[in-house]
Design a protein with these regions (language model features):
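Short, well-ordered alpha-helical microsegments
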Residues: 68-73
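Glycine-rich beta-strand-to-loop/alpha-helix junction loops that act as flexible
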Residues: 63-65
Length: 110
């Protein structure tokens, strides 16, 4: 009998370039999408392809160039709507809380 339980993924928009993100791993497996060196067109295509795998229960860690974060949030919302059987859908965004030295979840109902 197979186990169909979804293990959460933390989709990290861009390589953190020296910033510490390992604390986000408590929410799921870290998957860094972009290096930050891609052109906007290449970044758009890669974000589109990778975030098509996003499912309810996954997380988005928006870090990096503003345009890449905006595109990532758009695709995350789009694919969560497609990949979810629920309506509305929750988009889980990880936010760094400097004072507490931890990531917390901000959930947006879509």
């Amino acid at each position: 009998m197979s186990n169909n339980i979804h293990s959460p993924t933390v989709f990290v928009v861009q390589d953190p370039d020296g910033k510490e993100i390992t604390l986000a791993a408590k929410y799921g497996k870290l998957h860094v999408i972009l290096t930050g060196k891609e052109s906007t067109d290449v970044a758009l295509n890669k974000l589109h392809r990778v975030l098509s795998e996003m499912k309810p229960g996954d997380y988005l860690l928006p870090i990096g160039k503003s345009i890449n974060m905006g595109i990532a949030i758009h695709f995350a919302w789009h694919y969560l709507k497609i990949n979810s059987l629920c309506n509305p859908v929750d988009l889980n965004i990880l936010v760094w809380r400097r004072e507490q030295y931890e990531y917390t979840v901000e959930t947006i109902k879509l």
